[in-house]
Every structure is written in structure tokens, then in C-alpha cells.
Amino acid sequence: MAESSSESDHFRCRDRLSPWAARSTHRGTRSLPTVEVTEKVNTITSTLQDTSRNLRQVDQMLGRYREYSNGQAGAIEHLKESLEQSIDQLRSQRLLRNSGGRSISVTSLSASDLDGGTGSELHHFPPTSPLKDYGDPQGIKRMRSRTGVRFVQETDDMTQLHGFHQSLRDLSSEQIRLGDDFNRELSRRSRSDAETKRALEELTEKLNEAQKQEVVSDRVERRLQELEREMRTERELVERRQDQLGLMSLQLQEALKKQEAKADEHEGAIKNKLRQTETEKNQLEQELELSRRLLNQSEGSRETLLHQVEELRTQLTKAEGDRKGLQHQVSQISKQQSNYQDEQGEDWRFRRGVEREKQDLEKQMSDLRVQLNFSAMASELEEVKRCMERKDKEKAHLASQVENLTRELENGEKQQLQMLDRLKEIQNHFDTCEAERKHADLQISELTRHAEDATKQAERYLSELQQSEALKEEAEKRREDLKLKAQESIRQWKLKHKKLERALEKQSETVDELTGKNNQILKEKDELKTQLYAALQQIENLRKELNDVLTKRALQEEELHSKEEKLRDIKSHQADLELEVKNSLDTIHRLESELKKQSKIQSQMKVEKAHLEEEIAELKKSQAQDKAKLLEMQESIKDLSAIRADLANKLAEEERAKKAVLKDLSDLTAQAKSRDEETATIITQLKLERDVHQRELKDLTSSLQSVKTKHEQNIQELMKHFKKEKSEAENHIRTLKAESLEEKNMAKIHRGQLEKLKSQCDRLTEELTQNENENKKLKLKYQCLKDQLEEREKHISIEEEHLRRMEEARLQLKDQLLCLETEQESILGVIGKEIDAACKTFSKDSVEKLKVFSSGPDIHYDPHRWLAESKTKLQWLCEELKERENREKNLRHQLMLCRQQLRNLTENKESELQCLFQQIERQEQLLDEIHREKRDLLEETQRKDEEMGSLQDRVIALETSTQVALDHLESVPEKLSLLEDFKDFRDSCSSSERTDGRYSKYRVRRNSLQHHQDDTKYRTKSFKGDRTFLEGSHTRGLDHSSSWQDHSRFLSSPRFSYVNSFTKRTVAPDSASNKEDATMNGTSSQPKKEEYGS
């Protein structure tokens, strides 16, 4: 644009030079003074040509600077787009995960759940979990009935934890995005303030020009001063941009340092975790070694018992061989009774010794059997008790951890929602401020138009005065003076221009350095993006592993239940076997009562009494252990009460923090009100100045009419008046300088306020870092839970192997007992027959001995007493079993109460979440209203652009009329020289003013177009996110539907119809916004074409 304006000026200068040269040659023949005048005019033209060339160079430099600024803006927009794309990707991943969690619950819902709910309750998707329906209370009640606390299947609780964790991450990402938007709005506000100040300065300068009808030299000097001011403002802008870029680079470096520190902390935490896991592994290995040693010891004891049983078997075989030999000897002795009576007595003694040995062996066998039975039963009972205790402890520990995690997540969500509310209020305040600023800009633009009209009228009157001055000879002297002044001013301007070129070169070097820094920052940002993607992939892998672990845990718990049922069956079968053993023992005792061996029975009863006493001692020990467990449970309840008190204290602290934040918001609102009052005062001042300028213009018109009637008298008066106005202008400049100082002070105050806002942003960033640390703690807890689950799996596998071994050993012992019982029955039958035969033989000869032998056992032993004692013992055991069952019932009742409390807590949490999501829906409605207001503002801007086009057409018509008037004046031969001189000066001034006006107009249009582009990009991205969300939800609904009927119901449900309506609504505003952008581009291109034509 700058190049086109310079080229048009070049062609105009060429057209002007050719008639000037012809006229100079024509006058050369007349007289020598005219030659001197022509030489002076030629020098002026050469200087003007130089100035035009310099102006072209300046225009080129400005064009390059604009291109560079456009490129820089494009790079910044590219960065914004990349950031927004990353945010959209994170949102899409979050939506996919949330939709995955929702699809699991969709299969469990019925058709009534999908059909329930009104449109107002279902048509709002909250940002954290958009696929959840928080408006249907019946569906919540149904989910409550399903999602009770179950220790068999705890996947529901874990999915809720995943949902909370994802919502935390989404809220943190939204906080970061809102912070970036807040910083953008601050920068935009500062730019708009600078532009308003610049416009006000231009207005004051133009109004001063309208007031003062100065000579062309003064006007040229003023124009040069304006150029210097503009260059200074551009320098200041460049310096500010450099400072901003430096601050941005410093902020990015600080952020990188923080991220590196966080990464180092994360690595240290991971190393600590690895060390803890290694120590835990070592402890587990030690425990396994101890368990192996105990198993080896138990196996060694079993092997010794088996060896003892085998030795007893060998002894029994030997005894059978001895018995057979004795039978043979008894048959021989029965034949030779008469001859061998002495030998018979010895044989009888020997038999008694053998029988005593047999009785001792049988006692040992019975003792060993009882020991084996009791050892097996005790070991199995102890193992079962240990397993149950461990499971109960683990379940209680997991429940406490889940409660702590849910509480922490709730606190974090509350804090983040509060932060979101604050940020939304701040955004609304900034939107109102921007609307007011736009209104003020429009008023300022109207004032500038009126001032331009006034300046044009003043120029017309000046042209008439110049025509009157051309009739007099004194004008030539003044012209020479003006030429000298113009030459001096042009020389000064050249020097200043050279200085400015040097400054621009320095600025270009600094800009190149800044571009290098920006490229480095972009590379670092790409690396950070790659790290983010890697972290997200790791999180997804961890989630998959957690789901696998949960499924494995559910399967293991089902296997444990099946194993418990098997153990119960085994216990019942064992009780049956014990009854059978008891029956067999009763038969044995009956046979022994028939054989009247009461001495043997007394010894057995003594041994059994000792064993029963040992069992009683063991039962007492178990009772003491149960009491200790009860005390531990009471202590755990006390700890839980202390934790609740701590949580109450934390809630009180959070409320205090909330009050402090509300105070800060009230301060911000007060500051905004003060700014609004300042803008109102400025607007009133501008209106007053406008009225004053209009009055002065009226006075000027009346004075110009009087000047036409009185030429020579009024010229002197005008000179005096001009001098007075110069003094007034100097005074006015001083007042303006004082006002500029005041404005600088106000700018310092605003900077202080901005620093306060930055400090608040830093506080918000610190809170975000705290939330990230909390997320890290949750990850640590998640890894600890994972390690505990792996340890449980190992422990369950070890228990399964131990149970299998015990079952094999029990079967082997059963087989051995059956063999021993059969052998015992056969041996006792043979012994009974032999004893009966011996008793018959001895009763023939010695009846008295038989009476003494039979009477002894009745005195020493009574079987009825033994039965009574055994019955009392059995009754006592039954009573103890009943007491233990009552204790178990009480503990189960307590567990049920705890579960009910947990259910109530979960229901309360769900109600709170519903309230929060309703608040979020209200805020979304407010955002929709704000978008509508923005569309109305865009329509108003379009109308104003059309008005600008009409005004430009009027300006072009005025320019054409002025050209026609100038052509008419050129027809007069005497006024040609004066008109050409003034025309050159006026064209140079007008060309510079046009370049300035075009630059300001194109800058305003560029800002408006960039604003529209940002809005359209944001809308398209929101539409894309909504479309991906809708596609994901639709596909998941199809995948997880139970049948084609459920699919048809889902499509006919109000939710799906709302989705379709939502997509239509999002497409319509985007198309409207595209049309608006097209109209804006068209309106902006029309004035450009008109300016090119001019």
C-alpha cells in the first residue's frame, strides 16, 4: 500500500515538472530577476523531489515493518492454533475416555432410564464429564441400588475414581486455557489504550491546525513535528514489543525451569518408589523363606510320624508271628498237659508278657492317631483363620483408602470450580470494558471526521487568501522567506530522517534476534508437546493395566468364594467322617468291654483327657486373640474419627480462602468502575472541545468574509493575529505537555494495577502447581494399590498350593486310617477268640482265679462314667461353638452398618455433584447470551464499515472538485507560479497525510479482521470438538447396546434428538459467521480499490 501511494506521487511530480521547465524557459527571455526566481524555484523543486524520494523510502521501510509485524502476528496465530489443537486433542481424548466409562454403564441401563428426563435437564453437557446424565433422579436411585459396597466386585468404585481423576485433569487444562485468554485480553486492552491515546493526540493536533491559519512554512514545520512524533511512537511501540517479547521469553524460560524441576522431583519420587518396592520385595522373600521352613518342618514331623507307624506295623507283624508260634505251642501244650505242668506255667507267664507288649503297642497306635487327627485339624483351622483375618484387614484398609481418595478429589474439584467461577466473572468484566472501549472509539472516529471536514473548509479559505495575496508584490518577498525556511526545515528533516533510518536498522537487528529467540522457543514448545503426548500414552497404559488388575481381582475373589464353599463342603464331609470314626470307636469300646480289658481303657481315657485339656487351652488362646482383634477395631474407629475432624478443619480453611478471593474480586470491580468513570470524563471533555471548535469555525467564516472586502488592511491585522495565535499555540502545547505528564502518571498507576493482576495470576499458577502435586500423590497411591494387589495374587497362589498339599496329605492319612482300622479289627477279633479260649481252659481247673481276674476291672474302671464325661465334654464344645457363631453374627451386623454408612456418603456426594453440574449449565447459558451479543456487535461494525465507504466516496468527490478548481486557476497566466508553488507544498503535505491516514485505517481494519479470524477459528474448533464428541458417543452407544431394539430405543430417545439439534445449531452460527467474514472482507477491499484508483 505504501509503495502504491509513493508511485502515484512520483507520476504526479513528473507531470508537474514538465510545465514548470517550459515556463522557466519562456520567462528566461524576459528578464534576469525572473531567472533568479526560476533558479530558486528549481532548487525548491529539487529539494521537494529529494523529500519525495525520502518519503518513498520511508513508506517502503514502513511497508517492510508492517510485513514483518504481519509475519510476527501470523507466527503468533500459528502458535495459538497449535496450542488450541493440543487442547482440542486433550479434550477429545478425555471425551473418548469418559464415553468409554459411560458405555459400560449403558449396558446396565433399561429403556426407562434412557427415556426419562426432560429436555432442559438433558440438553446441557458439562465440561468435565459430558456423557453423564445428572438430571434424572430415578436413574440415580437405580444406580444406587446397583452400586452398593461389594467386596466381591469393586469395579464400580474404581471407575468412579477414574472419572474423578479425569475431571481433575480436564479442569486443570481448562484453567491453563483461561489463564492464556486472560493474558491475551490484557495485551489487547493495553494496545487499545495506546491506540486511543494516539487518536486523541491526532485529534488535538488537527483541531489546533483548524484553529490556526498559519503560513505554509509553519504548516510544514508542524507536519515534520508530527512525523517525528509518529516515529517516536513507533519506536516506543517497537521497544514495548521488544520488552513484551523479552518478558515472554523470560516467562517461558521460567516455565521450562519449573517443568525441569518438576521432572526432577518426579524422577526422585519414582526412585523412592522403586526403593520401597525393592524393600517390600525383600520382606516378601524373607516371609516366603520362613513359610518354606515351616512347611519343611511340618513335612519332617509328618515323615517321622509315618516312620513310627511303619515301625508299629512291623512290630504288629512280629507280634502276629509270635502269636502263631504261641498257638502252635499251646496246641502242643494242650496235648501234653499232664507231662508239662511246670512248663505250662512258664508259657502262661510268657503269654501274659506278650499280651502286655501288644497292649502297649495298641496304646501307642491310638495315641499317634489322636495326635495326627488333632494336628491336622488345628493346622487347617489356624490357616483358615489367618486367611480370613488377612482378608478382613485388607478390605478395611482398601475401604479407608477409597474414602480418603474420594474426599481429596472432592476438595480439589470444589477449589477448581471456585477458580472457574472467578475467571468467568473476570472475563465478563473484561467483555463489558471492551464494549465500552469500542463505543468510545466510535465516538472518537466521528470527532475525527468532523475535524477533517473543518480542516478542509479552512484550506479552502486559505486558498482564497492566497489568491488575494498573489495580486500584490509583497507576496514575492514572503515567498522567498518561505523558501528559505522550507530549505532549512527540509535540511533538518533530512538529518532527522537519517537518524531515524539508523534507529530502524538497529530495530531490525533487534527484531532478527527476537525472531531467533522465538524460533528457539517454538522448538522447545514442540519438545514439550512430544513429552505431553508420551505422558498421555503412559497414563492410558496405566489405566489399561488397572482395568486388567481389577478384572483379575474380581476373578480371584470369585475363586476364593468357590474355595470357601469347597472348604465348607470339606468340613461337613470331615464332620461326617468324624461321626463314622466315633461310631467305629464305639464298636471298639464295646468289643473291649466284652473282653473286659478295663485297664487298657483307663490309660486311653487319661491320654484323651490330656489332649482335651490342651484343646481347651488352645480355645482360650483363640478367645484372647479375638479380644485383641476387637480392641484393634476400636482403635481403628478412633483413628477414623480423628481423620474426620482433620477434614472438617480443612473445609474451614478452604472457606476462609474463598472469602479472601471474594474480597479480591470486589477490589477488581471497584477498579473497573473507576476506569469507567475516567472514560466518561474523557468523553465529556471531547464533547466540550468539539463545541468550542465549532464555535471557532463559525468565527473564522465570518472573519474570512470580512477579509474579502478589505484586502490590504486585514493582511496586517492577520499577521498580528497569527503572532498572537502562535503564542496561544505555544501555551496550548505547554498545557498538552502537562496533560501528557498526567497521562504518564495515570499509565504508571495502570501499570501498578497490571502488576497486581499479574501477581494474582501467579497465585493462580501456584494453586495449579498444588493441584498437580495432589495428582502426583494420587498416582503414588495408585501404584501402592497396584503393588498390594500383586502381593495378594502371590499370597492367594501360595495358599492354593498349600491347600492342595493339605488335601493330598489328608487323603493319604484317611487311607492309612482305614488300613489301620481293618488291621485293628482283625487283630482284636483274633485276640478276643484266643482270650475266650484261654479263659475257658483256665476256668476248668481254677475257677477262683477267673473270678479275681474278672472282678478287678469292675473296681478300677467304669464305662458309664467314661460315657458321662465324654457327653459333658461334647456339650461344652457345642456351647462354645454357639458362642462363636453369635460373635460372628454381631461382626456381620457391624459390617452391614458400615456399608450402609458408605452408601449414604456416596449418595450425598452424587447429590453435590448434581448441584455443581447444574451451576455449570447455567454458566453455559450465560456464555451463549454473550456470543449473541458479540454477533450483534459484529453486525453493527458491518454497518459502520458501510458508512465509512460512503464517507470515502464523498471524500473522493471533494478531491475531484478541488482538482477542477485548481485546473481553472492554472488557466490564469499571472497566478501560475504561485499556484504551482503552493500546489507542490499542499501535495507534499496531503501525500504524507494520506499515507498516515491509510496506515491508521489499514491498522484498524487489520485488527478487526484478526479479531474476526480468531472468532471464526474458535467457533470452528468448538464445532469440531462437538462433532468428535457426538461421533464417539454414537459409536459407543452402538457398540455397547444389548440388541437392535436397544439401539432403536436409543435413537428415538430425547438425548439423541438433542444431539442432532445441537449439531444443527452449531453449524448454523458457523455459516453465519463465515458470511459475516465474507462481507467484512468485501467492505474492506472496496475502500482499498478506491484508494488505489485515487
From Swiss-Prot:
It is found in: Cytoplasm, Cytoskeleton, Microtubule organizing center, Centrosome; Cytoplasm, Cytoskeleton, Microtubule organizing center, Centrosome, Centriole; Cytoplasm, Cytoskeleton, Spindle pole. Its main location: cytoplasm. Residues 1000-1009 have a biased composition (Basic residues). InterPro entries: CEP128 (IPR026652). One of its GO terms (cellular component) is nuclear membrane. GO terms for biological process: protein localization; regulation of gene expression; sperm flagellum assembly. Residues 190-827, 879-959 form a coiled coil. Residues 1-29, 115-140, 319-345, 987-1018, 1067-1094 are annotated as: Disordered. The modification Phosphoserine is found at residues 31, 249, 291, 331, 1061. Residues 7-17, 987-999 have a biased composition (Basic and acidic residues). Keywords: Coiled coil, Cytoplasm, Cytoskeleton, Phosphoprotein. Residues 328-342 have a biased composition (Polar residues). This is Centrosomal protein of 128 kDa. It comes from Homo sapiens (Human).
